[in-house]
Amino acid sequence: SADQVRNELQRELGQEASRARTFRDIFEYIDFYINACREGTILNGAGTRLTPGTIRSYLSTKSALRRYAEARHIRLTLESLTLDFYNDFVKYLNEATHSRGRYRPNVIGKFVKNIRTFLRYAFDNNYTLNSDFKRREFKVFQETVETIYLNEDELQLLYDLELPPSQAEVRDAFLVGCYTGLRFSDIGRLQPHHIRFDEGIIVITTQKTNRTIAVPICPKLRSIFARYDNCPPPTQSNQATNRMLKQLCRKAGITSKVYLTEVLGGERQIRCYEKCDLVTTHTARRSFATNAFKNDIPAALIMSATGHTTEANFRRYIR
């Protein structure tokens, strides 16, 4: 009968799974998975090692799962991460708060995406028979986020600030991003040999995509490098830079009112901000793309600098 066939199949699958490694709970498994990523046993889709940013995202997901398990007084295992878990986990995140407020849909979506990644590897390697992550309802949330950019006048205000060295370094590293479109992680990796003054370009292989790009050196960029003996400015951590950027933009007078529609805790609301409070390291990349586009530089040329492979992804950067 169909039941006999199903039971026999489950018995055989169970025997196969029993030969695989077992884990005390989901946290032991995630540690195992992250260590495999760090050692290069698990690679990304391009066949290269996962970036530090991806590892940090995995650790953040692990922390969210631990908070959930503690709040619900439950033990999480590979087998328990079912569709019922998914529904309750999303409900918990929509009701919970963290150090910066309520969880946004894209943050929840990132957690779910990472959980699906963990479960897929476990399923494919016979660490679990749980396949609920494949179900359509186990979906990743995604929201089109309203973001800002700094126009050329605002960049000039920032450029003209008289600052002590430690603050000037933060400002200048940010402006390098505004004038190149490089991600903050790549700005931190910039070395003098990447900067070809004789050719007027920066050539670097990006960390996230492993693509080699060439970016023109504009006059403003050249003058910034000159402040550091024709070397890139030093960078601080992403978190420290984001905190300082808000202060520097306020000092520069970048304080116009910005109204954003946001989803927080599952509720849509309109919130008012001063523009300086919305500036992050990623604002630099959006500012580069948007200002170049508004200056009628062809999208294909801007994409060659930013490393975007599709115009649809690129246009999400335009404000």
Describe these PLM feature segments:
Residues T180, R189-I224:
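Conserved tyrosine-mediated DNA breakage-rejoining catalytic core shared by Y-recombinases
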Residues R189-I195, F293-N295, M303-T309, I318-R319:
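A short, basic/aromatic helix-end/turn motif that makes direct DNA contacts
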Residues N230-T235, K246-S304:
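Short, basic (Lys/Arg/His-rich) helix/loop patches that form interaction surfaces
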Residues A214-R227, S304, R316-R319:
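DNA/chromatin major-groove-contacting recognition/catalytic segments
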Residues Y149, T206-N210, T306-R319:
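Catalytic-site neighborhood detector that most strongly recognizes the C-terminal catalytic loop/helix
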Residues P105, G109-F111, T128-F184, G188, ...:
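Basic, Lys/Arg- and aromatic-enriched nucleic-acid-binding interface segment
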Residues I34-G53, K62-E146, D160-L161:
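N-terminal core-binding DNA-recognition domain of tyrosine recombinases/integrases
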Residues S1-T54:
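N-terminal helical hairpins
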